[in-house]
Amino acid sequence: MSNVQTSAEREIVDLSHLAFDCGMIGRLKTVSWTPVIAGDSFELDAVGALRLSPLRRGLAIDSKVDFFTFYIPHRHVYGDQWIQFMRDGVDASPLPSVTTTKYPDDAGYVGTIVPKSNRIPKFLHQSYLNIYNNYFRAPWMPERTEANPSNLDRDDSRYGFRCCHLKTIWSAPLPPETKLAEQMGIESNSIDIMGLQAAYAQLHTEQERTYFMQRYRDVISSFGGSTSYDADNRPLLVMHTDFWASGYDVDGTDQSSLGQFSGRVQQTFKHSVPRFFVPEHGVMMTLMLVRFPPISPLEHHYLVGRNNLTYTDLAGDPALIGNLPPREISYQDLFRDGRPGIKIKVAESIWYRTHPDYVNYKYQLLEGFPFLDDAPGTTSGDDLQKAILIDHNDYNACFQSQQLLQWNNQARYNVNVYRHIPTVRDSIMTS
């Protein structure tokens, strides 16, 4: 009888680790990742402290912080190659890696240092792309499809991809392809009533898909069904935690800084994932996103930018609001120096559903507050996508120094995995 070990009891494995990370405002950063095996049960309890770099001025507004933990099967990354890999076992061809640049921090977006070979596993890079494309990219924006990290912009590879501003009237418009009118051909002397109803129905289903069902899972949900994350190879969002990071002002006490003060932000946090059963090999990735509310001293209410107010603008008539098509406006209608070439489409009377922030213009004359100095898109031409995505450079003037970039965190990720794996002693004492 052979004494070769072919199985193992399911034991708890402690994969806890510390992470000292830093990043930029508005960029999606991987802060922890753990490879997992089919049959695992994964638990995470992350505790730590988030700090913003020293602020130049007093603390004006809190920042919004989001933590996300995703599960991504390797099969979503490698496809049929992964299935064949597992079938062939020890005779399988090695899985390919992807190339990076030679700088140590150019894989920071996936939470690792670049090794000497300047290559990292493909599952890290592609899993990050899948997460971004499914959860952090507006559906009308083109997907990110870079085959290798070396193809990325250096800021993207070091700090993560740019994400959208928090929702406002100008940062969350309707898709650019939204129709403002719909034509129906009719005969000269008659109207097909049944055809008219059919046209209404067709328009309704087209609008539903344009506005609310741009992804397959949303379409199926509209029928009362649901789809597995396998249906469209999307990462599974296991847990999301969000909070507002606040702080305090520090008064200067020495002779040179007496009477001056600056803001300090230090916020403790906890992000927990209850026990999650892993159905097949993959990776658990935890990502972090820090954003300031998008506030500009140049923003004004939509009604303020209208020279001649019409009944439709001002009355808030429910009959009109419920039946008029979307309205096309420009950034010039919302910002003093907004670009007229940046057109957005919004629901009728959206200005009665939201209200802009107000900042006295004196703030515009000072540097150091976490406000947008210019109207969004001022430096990027008439590109709506660039106007909606956060540019961390807009906040450079807020910080006294960026030695640890714009935010940093120190955290312990308490990871316990229940796993079928022989003990270290069994591995040493082979056969």
UniProtKB/Swiss-Prot annotation:
Cellular localisation: Virion
GO BP annotations, alphabetical order: symbiont entry into host cell
Coarse class of the protein's main subcellular location: virion
InterPro entries according to UniProt: Capsid/spike_ssDNA_virus (IPR016184), Microviridae_protein_F (IPR003514), Microviridae_protein_F_sf (IPR037002)
Molecular-function GO terms, alphabetical: structural molecule activity
Superkingdom of the organism of origin: Viruses
Stored SUPFAM superfamilies: ssDNA viruses (SSF88645)
Keyword Metal-binding (UniProt): no
Pfam families, alphabetized: Phage_F
GO cellular component labels: T=1 icosahedral viral capsid
UniProt keywords, alphabetically: Capsid protein, T=1 icosahedral capsid protein, Viral genome ejection through host cell envelope, Viral penetration into host cytoplasm, Virion, Virus entry into host cell
Subunit structure comment from the entry: Pentamerizes and interacts with H protein, G and B pentamers to form 12S pre-assembly complex. By binding with protein D, induces joining of twelve 12S complex to form the procapsid. The procapsid has an external scaffold made of 240 copies of protein D, 60 copies of the internally located B protein, and contains 60 copies of each of the viral structural proteins F and G. Upon genome packaging, interacts with protein J. The mature virion is composed of 60 copies each of the F, G, and J proteins, and 12 copies of the H protein.
Other notes: Phi KhT, a host-range mutant of phi K, can grow on E.coli C and B, besides K12, and is more thermosensitive than the parental phage phi K.
Family indicated by similarity: Belongs to the microviridae F protein family.
Function: Assembles to form an icosahedral capsid with a T=1 symmetry, about 30 nm in diameter, and consisting of 60 capsid proteins F. Upon virus binding to host cell, one of the spikes dissociates from the capsid and the virus interacts with LPS through the exposed EF loops on the F proteins. After the genome had been ejected, the channel formed by the F proteins at the unique fivefold axis remains open.
Name of the featured protein: Capsid protein F
